[in-house]
Swiss-Prot record:
Organism domain of life: Bacteria
Species this protein is from: Photorhabdus laumondii subsp. laumondii (strain DSM 15139 / CIP 105565 / TT01)
Listed name of the protein: UPF0181 protein plu2693
Pfam families: UPF0181 (PF03701)
Sequence similarity: Belongs to the UPF0181 family.
Length: 59
């Protein structure tokens, strides 16, 4: 599977992790928290630099 992902600085990555952790402390499941933060990042970085990644887990 191919996917374009936002190119994030280390600081942006750290903030995303902290937000996911906070959402989980507030009772959200890890999957929901990750999905929410990922969607927010995609929206915020729409039209900006993207990094193409390949997920090799599909067989």
């Amino acid at each position: 599977m191919f996917s374009a992902m936002p190119a994030l600085s280390h600081e942006e990555q750290q903030r995303a992790v902290e937000k996911i952790q906070q959402l989980m402390v507030e009772g959200m499941s890890s999957g929901e928290a990750i999905a929410l933060v990922a969607q927010e990042l995609r929206e915020r970085h729409r039209g900006k630099e993207q990094v193409n990644v390949v997920f090799d887990d599909e067989k």
